[in-house]
Design a protein with these regions (language model features):
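Active-site donor-binding loop signature of nucleotide-sugar glycosyltransferases
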Residues: 102, 149, 290-291
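Pre-catalytic or accessory/regulatory segments outside the catalytic core
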Residues: 100-102, 118-121
Length: 338
């Protein structure tokens, strides 16, 4: 097996996309090193060819993308992360490629599009346990395996972090939690809150009370540093309370949750009870707040209380990327993907 990466293509991408892909590239590097899997670069030419063929196919139903298989000399059993589940057939829908779906936000009506987009792949890995069980119940004819997302082992540090802020608002925000944060800030003038805005291609982190810039969060490293400086973090699954309008009700646990644990943050969260949140046992770390009063009580407590580092470390042992290396090795052996 080999790994196909998008890292060259994302070099010119906007900050938001680049920081999203950083952890994906870290997973790829770990899998490559631990399983001795060569990394192949996806080229801008093939990316452009795939995009153009898809656009043409929408107008005239001629699958020009099938021509790519005639010139593709990479061989078989090529693993690739698919950050967004495709709704349309393309150059990677053939027996050579094994996609791992990170985000699955298709509606039930789009199930047929999923089948067509991955019909020729010998195996599809699905990160969301809820989606995996949904596809099983649908009788999905494509071989699928559950392959959950993870956190590189080196993110954990036994050193106790010095906290500079009560709350840093990083990552995508849940509108209900934002409402609670605004209410809390108005009632507590001493609340040290860092907000985020996107200006001129950069994420600007600034103190809410003064407007003073504390960070230009253009890199994943700077993001991780900010997480480690926040006493409390708010977390939400994508489809909760309209956080992502395109989520179609899907709510999976994302790496942000694991990053907040590694950053030694207390976590106040909004999430549903589903197969994925149960698989991650998210309730061991945080409960789903149901009211502002509950939010306020937790924030008051967490601003003055240390986290349980022993609990956090033990929890992450099951979700480090080294554990996913073992899972991928088992999948390779099960399907003879050598």
């Amino acid at each position: 097996m080999r790994i196909l990466t998008k890292r060259k293509i994302t070099e010119k991408a906007e900050v938001e996309r680049k920081t999203f892909f950083d952890i994906v590239f870290e997973w790829e590097d770990i899998f490559s090193k631990q399983l001795n899997l060569p990394i192949l670069a996806r080229t801008e030419w093939e990316f452009g060819f795939d995009e153009r063929c898809r656009k043409v196919y929408q107008k005239i139903k001629v699958p020009f993308y099938r021509l790519y298989s005639l010139i593709d000399r990479r061989g078989k059993n090529i693993f690739m992360f698919d950050c967004s589940t495709k709704r349309q057939d393309g150059i990677y829908n053939n027996s050579r490629y094994i996609p791992c779906l990170i985000d699955y936000f298709l509606s039930d009506e789009e199930y047929g599009k999923f089948l067509r987009a991955y019909s020729k792949n010998p195996l599809v890995l699905v990160s969301n346990r809820d989606v995996y069980e949904y596809l099983q119940k649908k009788g999905c004819p494509i071989p699928i395996e559950h392959f959950p997302l993870s956190l590189p082992d080196y993110y954990w540090n036994d050193e106790i972090y010095e906290k500079k802020y009560d709350l840093v608002m990083f990552a995508r925000q849940n509108p209900l939690l934002v409402e609670y944060i605004n209410m809390y800030e108005n009632k507590h003038p001493d609340f040290k809150l860092v907000r985020r805005k996107y200006e001129c291609g950069h994420y600007i982190y600034y103190l809410s009370a003064t407007g003073e810039t504390v960070s230009i969060g253009d890199s994943h490293e700077e993001y991780v540093k900010l997480v480690s400086q926040s006493k409390v973090a708010v977390y939400t699954t994508p489809g909760m309370d309209g956080t992502r309008t395109d989520a179609n009700g899907w709510n999976q646990v994302t790496p942000h949750f694991l990053e907040e644990i590694a950053g030694q943050c207390h976590i106040i969260a909004r999430y549903p009870d589903n197969a994925d949140t149960q698989w991650y046992e998210i309730s061991k770390i945080c409960k789903c707040v149901e009211s502002y009063d509950e939010f306020e009580q937790l924030m008051d407590k967490y601003r003055h209380e240390e986290v349980d580092l022993k609990l956090y470390k033990e929890y992450l042992q099951n979700h480090f990327t080294s554990k996913r290396v073992d899972m991928l090795r088992s999948i390779i052996e099960k399907y003879h993907l050598y």
